[in-house]
Structures are given as C-alpha cells and as structure tokens.
Amino acid sequence: MSASALDAFFGARLADTDPDLFAALEKEFHRQEDGIELIASENIVSAAVLEAQGSVLTNKYAEGYPGKRYYGGCAAVDIAEQLAIDRAKQLFGCEFANVQPHSGAQANGAVFFALAKPGDTILGMSLAAGGHLTHGAAPTVSGKWFNAVQYGVRKEDGLLDYEELEALAREHKPKIIIAGGSAYPRFIDFPRIRKVADEVGAYFMVDMAHFAGLVAAGIYPSPLPHAHVVTTTTHKTLRGPRGGMILTNDLELGKKFNTAVFPGLQGGPLMHVIAAKAVAFGEALKPDFKTYQQSVANNAKVLASTLVERGLAIVSGGTDTHLMLVDLRPKNVTGKATDESLGRAHITTNKNAIPFDPQKPAVTSGIRLGTPAGTSRGFGEAEFREIGLMIDRVVEGLSKAGENGSNEAVEQEVGAEVKALCKRFPLYRNH
C-alpha cells in the first residue's frame, strides 16, 4: 500500500470512507435520541462502554482463557478478561464467572451442553406464559434436542404456577429445571424451585437476563444462593454490551461450563466486547448504579399504575421489575396495531403475547414495556407518568378509529410531544 493509502486506512473517518453506512448510523442515532425507547430488553450504554467496544481489541484472537491461550500476544487481553471475571464475581457475590458467551442464548446453550444430553428432559417456562425461546420452545435447539416440558402461569392472576411446576417435575424427573423468562414481571421464588429440584435430582438453572441489573443492586432477590447455575445477558438492565455470561458457586461445574463454551460452542472470544463487559461491571459496582436500578423499578411501577388508571390491564396486576405486559383487550385493539401506532408517534415498544392469548403470535393481544433505557437517559417518575398518558392517548385513538382507521392526528400530536421531551434529555453529548 502507498503512504497515502496507509494514511487513509488508519486515519480516514467512516463518514468519508463509507457515507452510506455512516448515514444509516446517523439515522439510528437520531431514532434513539428523538424517540422514547420502551423495549424492555434494550438499554443505553455509557460512552466508556462504546469506547471499549470500538477499541483495538477487536483485532485480537484469543482462543482459550486468561493464562491459557492458544495464541501469543494475549497479555493485554488477559488483563481485560480477568477484570471482567473478577468484577462479575464481585458484583454478584459468586465464585465463578465465564464472560465469553457471545449472547444469552449461547450462555444457555453452553449450560445445556455441559449438564444434559440430547433426549434428556428439561423443564422451563413456556414462551406463551412469559418464558424465553431458549428454554425449550419447539423451534429452537433446546426444543429439538431435548424433551422439553413447559410450565406456565395461573389463568386467574397471571402469577407463576408453582404447583404445576412441582407436579411436572415429579412426573417427568427433568435433568434441568429452568426459571426466568422474557416477559414475566414478578419476583420468582427461587428457594421453592430449588427444593423441588433437589427432590427430583435436577439441576436448577436461573436465566436472569432481564433482571440481572436489579439483582446486582439488591432490588431483586439473588438466585445465586439457590441455583446450581445462573446465566444472563450483559445488556438489558445490566447496561453493558450485547453478550452473555455464566455464573455459579460450584467450581467443579464451572470447569464444565468453561469447556462447554470453549471449545464446545465457540472459538475465539470477542475481546472488544469482553473489555466493554469489564467496563460495564465496573460501572455497576459504583453506588450510583443502585440508585439507577431503584429508579428503573420505581419508574416501572409509575408507568404501570398510570396505564391501569387509564383503563388498561397489566398482566399479574403490576410489576416487581423493569418490565410489564400490557393486556390491550379492554380497548379492543391488538398488540400489532398498537406497536405500529406507537412507533409512528416515536415510542418504540414490541407486540407481545399475553398468557392464554387468543390472537396469533404475529398479532398478539399485548405489548411489553420496560423502563431501563428511558431511565438511563434521565427520565424520572414524572416523565414516565407523562409517557403513560401518551401511550393511553395513542391506544384510545386507535380504539376509537378501529383497526383499519387512521390514528394519524393523535400520532402526530403525541410524536411532537415525544420529541420535545427527548430534547430535554440528549444522548452522548460529544456525538
């Protein structure tokens, strides 16, 4: 390469080298800054986390674990990964952490790979009741490789049906019992599930991907004293980069999990992401993280109560966490139509099935809402009450217009208010 080509390679900005992609990134930045993000699994990371992810560590291959790599030149990345491991252990008060999984699904897959064989029985919460795809849903690897038995929630109150879980465990004698999910808003009784796991000889696994940040802050009961193994994502409430992690207090199981991650499921770890995990865990160890998580929980309660006041129903009657599942049937609108209408008003949500949903999965009777991203940008209880009223106006307008009618006037009015609110809480000051 010529000197000028090298200068461009190492010094040119993305806006100059790839304007089409740069335009897409700018479009996404303004979508995030000018709109209200209520998807419960999304958050806004710090500038420091972004910096770590965009660092030179993206250039480094590092198969293996700190001090035991299959490549040379790993001294610096060993430091980064060990920081992530040590901080994760300190944050959750556990003896072992594997920070290499590329996602929560990979973390769950590694646990299954370590503890079960194809054809074994696993017991998890059904997707329809608020569980996660990776806990045995039919289209997934866990649903195809294992005999996946599913428990749910009670029809009368939307709360986890512990009696059904216990009966299924005693009947099927699963190898693994899984707790946690993607749309269950209440505390889970971990000691009760561990008791039945011990009774039937099962491993007890908790997927705390959604509420890990609340656990770290002491707001949600920790599963670590009760579960054989805990998995999580590192984004969502934990407010780190997109990735996964495995935690346990059993060092012998930890050895199995290490082998299951590498070489079992993955090759080279993403060292730039692991460095960003270390940054996020360091942030979570600071006192203001607990304040943030308490605000996340308080804001969720305010949002839920505001919606209930306006005639909407919340599955299980409320929330103990950062998320809630809104039952739209009282307004005779679908999750799909509501999600799309809110989106045009610059409020991002996701349509979500409610327990015992009569609608098809692509339509749904509900939407799922969460407060982590809004809280990260500075929204407090007053703002979330305002957001709840905005949502109600969009839903009410949609209800009056009918599924095929136009809600454009309401969407435009609310959209202008959303932009005015967001302007008071800008993102990334140096963008």
UniProtKB/Swiss-Prot annotation:
Enzyme class: transferase
Cofactor(s) essential for the protein: pyridoxal 5'-phosphate
InterPro entries from the UniProt entry: PyrdxlP-dep_Trfase (IPR015424), PyrdxlP-dep_Trfase_major (IPR015421), PyrdxlP-dep_Trfase_small (IPR015422), Ser_HO-MeTrfase (IPR001085), Ser_HO-MeTrfase-like (IPR049943), Ser_HO-MeTrfase_PLP_BS (IPR019798), SHMT-like_dom (IPR039429)
Repeat is among the record's keywords: no
Pathway(s) of this molecule: One-carbon metabolism; tetrahydrofolate interconversion; Amino-acid biosynthesis; glycine biosynthesis; glycine from L-serine: step 1/1
EC number(s) reported in the record: 2.1.2.1
Molecular function terms from GO: glycine hydroxymethyltransferase activity; pyridoxal phosphate binding
Reactions catalysed: (6R)-5,10-methylene-5,6,7,8-tetrahydrofolate + glycine + H2O = (6S)-5,6,7,8-tetrahydrofolate + L-serine
Subcellular location: Cytoplasm
GO BP field: glycine biosynthetic process from serine; tetrahydrofolate interconversion
Binding positions ((6S)-5,6,7,8-tetrahydrofolate): L127, G131, H132, L133
CDD domains on file: SHMT (cd00378)
GO cellular component, one term: cytosol
Top-level division of the source organism's lineage: Bacteria
Job of this protein: Catalyzes the reversible interconversion of serine and glycine with tetrahydrofolate (THF) serving as the one-carbon carrier. This reaction serves as the major source of one-carbon groups required for the biosynthesis of purines, thymidylate, methionine, and other important biomolecules. Also exhibits THF-independent aldolase activity toward beta-hydroxyamino acids, producing glycine and aldehydes, via a retro-aldol mechanism.
Listed PANTHER family: SERINE HYDROXYMETHYLTRANSFERASE (PTHR11680), SERINE HYDROXYMETHYLTRANSFERASE 1 (PTHR11680:SF35)
Subunit structure: Homodimer.
UniProt family annotation: Belongs to the SHMT family.
UniProt-recorded name of the protein: Serine hydroxymethyltransferase
